[in-house]
Amino acid sequence: MLMLMLVAAVTMWLRPLVTAQLCRSRTVRTGKVFNLIQDVQGDRLYFHPTTTRLIKHPCEKNIALYLGKQVFFTMDNFETSLLPFTIPTSMQVGVPEVTSAHFAGSLLLLVVDQKVYIYDYENNSWSMSLGIKHPVTHVSGDNCCYTGSLFCVHVSNLVFAYFRGDQISQTYIYYSNTGGFSFWKYHYDRQAEIIGSLGGIFHFFSLSQVAMLVVNQGKGMFKYSDHPLNRSFGLSFDYNGTLDILIAPGQRGILLLWFENSLLFSHNAGQLVDTVRVKKGDQTLFSSIFEAKITIHNIAVTENELAVITREDNLYYGNLGIVPSSIIKFADQYIWSEDVALMFRSPGTLEILTPLRDTAFPAFDFQKCLVNIQALLMDPELHVGKCKIEFLTGEFIYRMYTIDMHSQLELTASLIPQPGTSLIPLVMVSNPHSLGFQATFYENGYTSDGNTKYKLDIFLKQQQHWGRTDSNFTSSLKKATMSTLTVDIANKEISCVDIKPLSTLISVGCDLDKKIVIQNKVSACSMGILDPLTLQDNYSFIIEKEFYDPGFQGQQSSEDLHVFYSYQQLGCPLLVYYDTLWKPVVELWRKDSFQEVIDAEYVLLEVNGQFSYSYSLTAQSAMCTSQPQNWTTMIKEFGGPFFWNRENYVSCHDPNNNAPLRWPDVQYQILGGRTANQIIFGHNGFYVFYISIVDPYYSYCQLETIFSIYVYGAFPVQLVSAGVVILLIISSILGSVWLAYKTPKLLRTARGRRIKKCATQLCRRCKTVCQFRASATARAGTEPPGRHRTPHGGRSDH
């Protein structure tokens, strides 16, 4: 009996010792020696649920928000004592209860008392979101952490605001593309027909879909917005409580759905949702959290890891991969309290955070317990297998790529297994509806200690261009999408904490490095017609009122237009002869490298409203099967010029275009593509053109630019109309014929003979005068200079 008591005492003494070695606790207490921290000012925020939340900024690793009985905001990972987070009383929030929070770039969005408030932590300022007219309880969004990408800025700025639990057919949903500053009503397709309550609405960028969680009769399922997933719901799953949905960072499509008695996992943005299993080694102990009778208090999620702390004072850990997710239980530890929360500091390093109230100061201290996951996994009682991966890397990690229309991408990864083991690599794309790939895995030499090195070559392009999928599977080719590429190892052991999956974000959309340039081999300056120095010296020209319309409708203006020529923007104009059918040679450039001559469809518009040019083809001669678009109709439809682009262009050769061909003789104003349409000029002078590539299948970019030409060689404009000129010519001919007929008859009369006699005498006199002047000129040429005979025989000096 004495021996048993001694063993029990030793066991109880060793247990906290082991716990201390695995989880080293320390208390953060700062700013209290000299009482530097001020009192709490404003309305103190709080979070009502019995569980806690700790939201880390996905990109700024030191910024986080703690939600519990008190709310704390930190910019240094809780390394200083903090006052409870408050909102200024001037905001007049009413009940300062926080129901949802989200980081949108450098902004913190908080739903307080069913309204959305914005805290700009960089400028320490508060504001209220505009445009929300109805109560909301939650906000949702995502963050993209690739720096220097406009696409990432767009991702971070998109936010939804909604009332969770409302009937979908009657609820109001709001969206923002300004990071939460302004919201607009969001109209989900056929929303009024959806039966069920709203569990949330999210923009899954990994799938390029807006997804709505529909809850009905104890089942949840995601409904998607766009083809091809909008034809049906995702697979249903048990919805036994109000689930919080966490989108794992990295845009890989990983979701965690949880409440106190349930933990669900999806690796494809909600299309398939499964329970998280509880395992010990390779053995599955429980198929779900509910079956294991676990009560979750808080969870922490990164791109690849998951940690769970329960009210039963247990800590669980798992990794997030393509296989069904599972967690393992670590040794029992005294770590739980009603205020405890979890957060990952780095891969394999977990921090257990507990706010500590100070009776003497208003600022709270923080107890931090740092857990080394790798050390815990080495416990032989966990039966965790040894990691079989020695090395896994790729040059594409931490980078973002773009695949434009008809483009392709090649990436490589390197892999070295542990000696005596073999591995199977997994290559996955989060959006197979828009991005396809082909991978090759092969040996690539040996390491210095004899291990085999392997290389993985991945060739990617748009799924539609592989030619091996049905149109019912692929997304719309006209729509820009995105996908995440992930390289991982099949059946990877949970002990591979430091071997993270290789992941990169691929935008199937506009390559921002692309631009169009108009070929200008023969310019007005190189041919000597215009002087570049003159063009640079505030040069201007006049467009006569007969040849331009400021409204771009082809109507004459009331006054001439004085135009300044921007040489810095336009350079020397391209030279065009008026009597030649013409169209520009459009070149595609990427950065400073020429790519190709563009043969896609495009449109031109003279930016000053000139209309003294026409097109060589009509709708009929261009073989249109439907009425073609033109600048007149597009300007009327969109309220101004320069809005004709790939987004609104509809080809008159498209068999799906049902617009009847009512006016076949109208000018066909689209150049390039399948037609030989060209431009005809009838007037000399400067033309400054706006060009836009409208072919939706050439590039996802809005390729546009302006350029100038100089037309020469046209005849001067007639001041008298052609009808008047023709009338005068005909009158002259008729008058000549009449005189030829009438004159002979007139000469036979007495009056005619007198006229004839006078004319004869006049001719003789003119002949005599001419002979005299000719002889005088001849004599003057034979005498010495300065002297000639006078008519009277004398001499005259000059």
Swiss-Prot record:
- GO cellular component terms, semicolon-separated: CatSper complex; plasma membrane; sperm principal piece
Signal peptide limits: 1-20
- Disulfide bridges in this chain: C23-C369, C59-C145, C144-C152, C387-C496, C510-C701, C525-C572, C624-C652
Residues carrying sugar:
N123, N230, N240, N472, N538, N630
> Which BP terms from GO are recorded?
flagellated sperm motility; sperm capacitation; spermatogenesis
Per the record, the major location class is membrane
Superkingdom: Eukaryota
List residues in topological domain: Cytoplasmic.
Answer: 746-798
State the name under which the record lists this protein: Cation channel sperm-associated auxiliary subunit delta
* Species of the source: Homo sapiens (Human)
Q: Which gene encodes it?
A: CATSPERD
